[in-house]
Structures are given as structure tokens and as C-alpha cells.
């Protein structure tokens, strides 16, 4: 790994990965490829002389080919995607165009380029679909996505895997829990609740608020991706998951405690999603076999730190109605 292209590198998970790699390796050139969408920010990246920004769309075949050849890219780490489930119900075609077609463009450019050592594709645990309270999803489990976002991620995975089987393109796929941490645009649950509390607004609870998610810190994800890139087996898929399951109401309670306000006074119940998976639960023994361990285990402590971070840094995001 000498010249690495990180798609979506101005976004949430992408920027955390860029900052991790930049601080850990002093001999890696990082090319941040990003369209600069509403949820991205140049302030998310800790820039230095080894990190360079290329503004572009992953559907732009010519620009991707030029970037690969001009910078002698040996590794692609593909984070770029539309990822907000609520938006996928409203504009599903845009999700297909970027998440499926955009990924296909990257793969075809990689095949034609012919010098790539690794194409890493970040996916989500949502591709497994909803499971009950006793089940877990392994890497070989059936994919059964239930919303347009998850369906596009599953579709992209199938194309990625086909390029490994058909063209021997060196690929690795990872599926991740719900990620939280710095640099996340406040449309997702945790930063949205934090910013609402900071602005004195109600916390909007979809449905009953009883749906559950496992939350993993972005720093743990960056470390896991780094490990998989360097030690993972080509052609394999790895779950990146933890046991840190909380309901939406649990998260609201923790954040209200941090803000020093009464939970019941802050809640406003709104209609649920068209389909809202109750829970996901993935195994992590495969990635643990590579030596990965979760480091950010104290969820409440991390949320206190994150609350303070958004107090100072939410200005970088154009949040409607924010003070």
C-alpha cells in the first residue's frame, strides 16, 4: 500500500479512515476522491503533504481512469455512497445510480487499469435484513435487504464479488454495524439528537423508538479496515461488529442525561419509516481471528466526548435551523 485512493474520503467513515492511515503510516500517499456532497466537509480531514483532494463523481469513468494512472494507485478503499435510509425511501433511484452504478464504474476502471493490488468495498450489516432477538448473521448468511439503501449495498456487493470471480480482481468486502463518532453529518441518529439538544429542539422518535442497533465507534472501524486491508484474505467478506446494542430510546435517554434535561420533555413521536428493521446482529469472530479488538468500549463516555465535540464543530455542517 503506497498510493491509496479513498472514495468518499470527505465523509464520515472515510475521513476517519484517512486520518487514521495518515497518522499511522508516513510512507503512504492518500488521494481523497469525493464529490463534496452535503454530508461531506474538507474540515473532516487532517491534511498534510501526503493527502490530496480530487473532487469528482465515482460515476465519472474518464476521471477515475485518469486518477488511477496519473497517481499509480495500488489500493482503492471504497466508502463513497448515499447512506441515509430515510432519503432512500424518497429518492431511491439516486441511491442506485451512486451505490450500484458508481461502484460498477470503479470496478470496471480497476479491471482496465490492471495494476490494482486491492479493491476494498465497505458495506453494511443492513444487507442481512431484520433478524429476531436470538439470531446472528454470519458472513455466509443469506442477504435479505428490506429498504432501498440496503438493497443497493447488497447489489453493489454482488457486482464486487463477480469481478473477483470473473476477472480475478483482488477484492475484500466488509459489513459494518451502525457507526458513530466525529465527522458524522447530523442526519443520523446520534449526531442528530446531539445537535437537537444543543439547539433546544425536540428529539424526533420514529415509531415507538424500540428498534435496536449495535453501535461501533468510527475509530474502531478505521482500525478494522486497516487490518483487513493488510491482513485479510483476498475474495473474502468480513463483518465488523461489536456487542453494544441500544434502542433509539436508550440513546435518547443517555444523551438527555448528558445534556441535563428530562427525557419525556424532549421527545416528539413522528411516523415510522415505511419499513424499519427491528434489529441486526452480526458475528465478529472472523475479523477477530485477524487480531482485531474493539478499543472504544465505554459507550456513555464516548457520547460525552462526542457531545462536547459537536458543541465546537457543528458549524462545519449546514444544518437547517441550527444556531
UniProtKB/Swiss-Prot annotation:
Cofactor or coenzyme needed: NAD(+)
Origin: domain of life: Viruses
A Pfam entry, by short name: GDP_Man_Dehyd
Any one biological process term the GO annotation gives: nucleotide-sugar metabolic process
EC number: 4.2.1.46
GO terms assigned for molecular function: dTDP-glucose 4,6-dehydratase activity
InterPro entries cross-referenced by the UniProt entry: dTDP_Gluc_deHydtase (IPR005888), NAD(P)-bd_dom (IPR016040), NAD(P)-bd_dom_sf (IPR036291)
Keyword NAD: yes
Keywords: Lyase, NAD
Entry keyword Phosphoprotein: no
CDD domains in alphabetical order: dTDP_GD_SDR_e
Coiled coil regions in record: none
Family matches, as SUPFAM superfamilies: NAD(P)-binding Rossmann-fold domains
Catalysed conversion reaction: dTDP-alpha-D-glucose = dTDP-4-dehydro-6-deoxy-alpha-D-glucose + H2O
Active site: 125 (proton donor), 126 (proton acceptor), 149 (proton acceptor)
Binding site residues for substrate: 124
Family named by the database record: Belongs to the NAD(P)-dependent epimerase/dehydratase family. dTDP-glucose dehydratase subfamily.
UniProt name for this protein: Putative dTDP-D-glucose 4,6-dehydratase
Lineage: Viruses, Varidnaviria, Bamfordvirae, Nucleocytoviricota, Megaviricetes
